[in-house]
């Protein structure tokens, strides 16, 4: 990611953030019905390099899709390509929480197999939620809320009426651990 970031953004470097994809052993499709699930983080994930650019514009390069876009944080529509709508949606949801998001340059990639049910989208959302919380929010937003930012991004900008399991596993997941999650109360262990 770093070499692509340097190539696209005039040799500068930024901060690197990453979040994992997930597996789920029990309870697939029960999270959006407030049921119990048994997910865990996996080694595969999304990694992004991000650097504020002192503007209101996001300049984003998807390494895997070989695609680049620029969009304004003040644009009510956002980009049309789905992989960039995730980034746009996280920005907008963080701004709704009062995080003073500013423009940034980013390059991102992942090794979560697309379409394999391992939540590459949640890993992308979580990566950017962690990054924006760090860069612009002083890390004041708690992990529960960051997971909900990802879920709201799916609902409001992608059109997917998902539950919370994918984002929760990406935000709270730990290596070599599974978690029992009650999707109604968000209690887990």
Which positions does each model-derived feature cover?
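Anion-binding (especially nucleotide phosphate/pyrophosphate-binding) glycine-rich loop
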Residues: 1-16, 44-149
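Short Gly/Ser/Thr- and Asp/Glu-enriched loop/turn motifs at secondary-structure junctions
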Residues: 18-20
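Short Pro/Gly-enriched beta-strand edge/turn motifs at strand-loop
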Residues: 28-33, 152
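Short, surface-exposed beta-strand-loop junctions and turns on beta-sheet-rich folds
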Residues: 32, 66-68, 187-188
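Short Gly/aromatic-enriched secondary-structure transition segments
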Residues: 34-41
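ATP-dependent small-molecule kinase catalytic core of the GHMP/sugar-kinase superfamily
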Residues: 138-189
């Amino acid at each position: 990611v770093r070499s692509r970031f340097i190539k696209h953004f005039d040799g500068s470097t930024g901060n690197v953030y990453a979040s994992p994809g997930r597996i789920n052993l029990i309870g697939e499709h029960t999270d959006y019905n407030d049921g119990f699930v048994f997910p865990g983080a996996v080694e595969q994930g999304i990694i992004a390099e991000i650097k504020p650019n002192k503007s209101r514009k996001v300049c984003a390069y998807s390494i895997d899709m070989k695609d680049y876009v620029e969009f304004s944080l003040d644009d009510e529509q956002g980009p049309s390509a789905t992989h960039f709508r995730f980034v746009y949606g996280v920005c907008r949801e963080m701004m709704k929480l009062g995080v003073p998001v500013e423009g940034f340059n980013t390059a991102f990639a992942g090794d979560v197999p697309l379409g394999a049910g391992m939540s590459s989208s949640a890993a992308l959302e979580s990566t950017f939620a962690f990054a924006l919380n760090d860069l612009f929010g002083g890390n004041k937003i708690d992990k529960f809320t960051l997971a909900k930012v990802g879920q709201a991004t799916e609902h409001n900008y992608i059109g997917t009426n998902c539950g919370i399991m994918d984002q929760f596993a990406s935000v709270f997941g730990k290596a070599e651990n599974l978690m029992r999650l009650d999707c109604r109360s968000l209690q887990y262990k």
